[in-house]
Amino acid sequence: MPAPDSTTAILDAAEALFARQGFAATTIKAIGREAGVNPALLYYYFPDKERLYHAVLERRLGNASREIGERLTGSLPPLETLAQVLRGYARLMHGAPNLPRLLAREFADHQAEHALPMIREISAGLFQKICDVIRAGQSGGSIRGDLDPRFTAVSLVSQMAWFFVAQPAVSRMLGYEGVVPAARVERYVDHAVRFSLAALTSAPAPSAKATRKRVRS
């Protein structure tokens, strides 16, 4: 029976190639070569390339869901819980550099078709828990009551996700060639957490309608 390390090597190689060149351009033969195993061995674990791709997505998204979910089960106040979630999400994305590219390709090339079951599961569990934390903060008075918890949850995660997904552009905006240095990533994460918590607790901005009314008067 093949060693468990073979599975890890295959998944690592497949993840790197799918992220770098996409699902369609990646062959079983190339994955075997990258993993340093006979391509025939891949079929011992996975019946076809699509099942292997699903396994790659499941490994990363499943790990993300579990790790972030752990931060939502503690007894910290809502704002501290959300800060922990954001930091955990950033740590995951930074620690798995293929994940942002893999997700970007999945959304752009396949409209999230392969990841849809996992996204539904995350939406039903993790996303709803984040919304519940926001609602708890609103009920307790620590988070503004005028915010839609669903939009707020999307905004919190998106600003952290975009930093990693758009890394090639972000690095150049910040004056770097290649990846953003780890120390600078940490500074951005600190900024994003402070920025988010300030938005959740500060007074709401005047609406466009109210602004027009003041101008006319």
Task: Identify the meaning behind each predicted range.
Residues E80, P117-I122, S139-S155, R187, ...:
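All-alpha amphipathic helical-bundle segments outside canonical DNA-binding/catalytic cores
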Residues S6-A14, I31, V56-R60, A64, ...:
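Generic hydrophobic, amphipathic alpha-helix propensity
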